[in-house]
Curated annotation (Swiss-Prot):
Domain (MPN) ranges: 20-154
Role description: Component of the eukaryotic translation initiation factor 3 (eIF-3) complex, which is involved in protein synthesis of a specialized repertoire of mRNAs and, together with other initiation factors, stimulates binding of mRNA and methionyl-tRNAi to the 40S ribosome. The eIF-3 complex specifically targets and initiates translation of a subset of mRNAs involved in cell proliferation.
Biased composition (Low complexity): 250-261
GO CC annotations, alphabetized: eukaryotic 43S preinitiation complex; eukaryotic 48S preinitiation complex; eukaryotic translation initiation factor 3 complex
Residue ranges that the Swiss-Prot or TrEMBL entry lists as coiled coil: none
GO MF annotation list: metallopeptidase activity; translation initiation factor activity
Name of the featured protein: Eukaryotic translation initiation factor 3 subunit H-B
Subunit structure: Component of the eukaryotic translation initiation factor 3 (eIF-3) complex, which is composed of 13 subunits: eif3a, eif3b, eif3c, eif3d, eif3e, eif3f, eif3g, eif3h, eif3i, eif3j, eif3k, eif3l and eif3m.
Species the sequence originates in: Danio rerio
Any one of the GO BP annotations: heart development
């Protein structure tokens, strides 16, 4: 589990993680893991190791989850993690569990599986984070590595397992209050920084002008297609909820009419001196329809928001490149 370093006055801080410092070696390991085992839409995952210093989470190492098929029924992930951390401890490497990482394609990572996994990690280890690595965006020239945590409000909802509309409304949980992004700082050794500086000095002007090349339109096309698919899913969920609301309203109306008829009958029987009708259990007679789960709808809305942000970043970068290219060409052209 993660461990907090004590402050100079001997007190342990319980403030939430506000920043993540990740070693460059860890970033390279994550990229290498996807290049070796990620095929097409295959998702790769692994464990993050490190420690917590005050309000900063330091990620110093990681190791991957091996890919296994249905034939590997005897594979135990928990046992595998324990063996790996025990081996790292023997060679004096940080072995404290601080989260996990996962690859994604086109930013499509918001799912119930990720929510359940991160809740399990964060419930057991308060400082846990999940790193999301997008290899497609990284291949276009900019490293796409983001860290997320579940918000305190969502953690409470998941603990209570109350995903009804009333529960979510009472807790004020919307799609924008599900995940919180934690800023990442990549730390390299002095030798690596010197090497990067030398590579920058050796790069030619032609190489630098390649940065103005527009990104592939296929990325935008795929993002828009996935956005449309999620909007269709949202539309279907809205239809299901509207049908539930109509069924509930119709049943409440029938229940109200039944109660009124019973009251009128009892009033007539009382006027004739007859005993009132026996009371009946209305909850058994009018069972309310099962409400559809709202958490899936929130996840879809959150994923739609992520796609919109991805498309916004993509288009803004290309527009910026167009303006810079126009400025470099000069007024004569």
């Amino acid at each position: 589990m993660a461990s907090r370093k004590e402050t100079p006055n001997g007190k342990t801080l319980d403030t939430p993680v506000k920043q993540i410092q990740i070693e460059g070696l860890v970033v390279m390991k994550i990229i290498k893991h996807y290049q070796e085992e990620g095929q097409g839409s295959e998702v790769v995952q692994g464990v993050l190791l490190g420690l917590v210093v005050e309000d900063q989470l330091e990620i110093t190492n990681c190791f991957p989850f091996p890919q296994h098929t249905e034939d590997d029924a005897d594979f135990d992930e928990v046992q595998y993690q324990m063996e790996m951390m025990r081996s790292l401890r023997h060679v004096n490497i940080d072995h404290l569990h601080v989260g996990w990482y996962q690859s994604t394609l086109y930013g499509s990572f918001v799912s119930r599986a990720l929510l359940d996994s991160q809740f399990s990690y964060q419930h057991a280890i308060e400082e846990s984070v999940v790193l999301i690595y997008d290899p497609i965006k990284t291949a276009q020239g900019s490293l796409c590595l983001k860290a997320y945590r579940l918000t305190p409000k969502l953690m409470e909802i998941c603990k209570e397992k109350d995903f009804s509309s009333e529960g979510l409304k009472k807790a004020s949980v919307g799609y924008e209050h599900m995940f919180e992004e934690v800023p990442i700082v990549i730390k390299n050794s002095h030798l690596i920084n010197v090497l990067l500086w030398e590579l920058e000095e050796k790069s030619t002007a032609a190489d630098k002008h390649e940065l103005l090349s527009l990104s592939s339109s296929s990325h935008l096309e795929k993002s828009l297609q996935m956005l449309m698919d999620r909007v269709d899913d949202m539309s279907q969920d809205i239809v299901k909820y509207n049908n539930y609301s109509r069924s509930l309203s119709k049943q409440q109306q029938q229940k109200h009419q039944y109660v009124q008829r019973r009251q009128q009958e009892n009033a007539q029987r009382q006027s004739r001196g007859e005993p009132p009708l026996p009371e009946e259990d209305l909850t058994k007679m009018f069972k309310p329809p099962q409400p559809p789960p709202r958490m899936d709808t929130l996840l879809i809305a959150s994923q739609i928001n992520t796609y919109c942000q991805t498309i916004k970043e993509f288009t803004s970068q290309n527009l910026g490149k167009l303006f810079m290219a126009e400025a470099l060409q000069g007024p004569s052209s």
